[in-house]
């Protein structure tokens, strides 16, 4: 149990690999154009999955912590802290998802000639940087949440 930190590191690692591969295929022009498009869509979907897992983790652990506080008479501070954890990650994860959708959509617009210049590329670089920042914040908050869950588990074990 409590493996979310490791799971998230694995998800984020492969997300970074996909970001690098997608950007490389877009810059290098050594591949067929469809490879960059396919990799971009795959990377977009995988990024949405990664952030969705983080959102689901905080929904689930928040409910579990709230139930533990009520059932075992633990301090209400635990429930307050879990709400704060959720608040620190939800906005970033949601905005990261919206931005990745926008950059994939703009890639499609560029492909059909609705978008000229480097708009898609520059937005993609920004979105990758923003996602890396989001991953860093999400990992830190997941670690804090895991520490709090361990603390709650220890308190419950000591009461028994």
Predicted regions, residues:
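Inner-leaflet juxtamembrane helices
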Residues: 52-71, 135-153
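Membrane-interfacial helix-loop-helix connectors in multipass membrane proteins
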Residues: 28-35, 109-121
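Short membrane-interface loop/juxtamembrane segments of multi-pass integral membrane proteins
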Residues: 66-92, 152-160
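Alpha-helical transmembrane segments and their immediate juxtamembrane interface regions
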Residues: 2-5, 113-158
